[in-house]
Amino acid sequence: MSDEIVNRVASSALITFNLEEYYHAGERVVYDIRQNLFQDLILKEKEFRAFVKEYDWQKYEGKNVAITCSTDAVIPTWAYMLLATKINPFANLVVFGDLNALEQALFQQALDKIDLDQFKDQRVVVKGCSNVEVPVFAYVETIRLLQPLAKSIMYGEPCSTVPIYKKPN
């Protein structure tokens, strides 16, 4: 009998899918249109357009920007669109919504670039532990992308997994 210790995890055919690898490390900022409202309620078009024209949008260079309004004011859609036209040339990504919407869009962008063919008929472990906060959206989107391809999908670490999906025979 051999006393050799065999690492069966290392020699298994599992592919680890680590969502942390798809985390965009860039700065995230919120542009709150509330700062452009009169009495936190009214967007005055003339003043807003003048502000948009004169403001130094370069401060958003390379940043990920969520455009939102933190008050219950009714903001015309064109106002958000106008802001986006000025921020887009400088920012990495611009979305409408809060920081959660921004995080979701960043993960979506990264996941859309993955060559999924590598997961065809493979046993995949979606890594559960991470040094960065990975939104639940990213895990659900990963299942949507991998389920049609993978032989099986598990969650956790290769040494301790929770079965999520197994392709029917």
Regions found by a protein language model. Give the residues of each.
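Long, charge-dense
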Residues: 79-118, 156-161
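Short glycine-rich or small-residue beta-strand-to-loop segments that form or flank ligand, phosphate
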Residues: 64-70, 95-97, 123-129
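Extended, charge-rich low-complexity interaction segments
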Residues: 116-140
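Short coil/turn connectors at secondary-structure junctions
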Residues: 62-63, 90, 120-122, 150
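A domain-level signal for the structural core that forms small-molecule/cofactor-binding pockets
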Residues: 52-53, 128, 137-138, 145-146
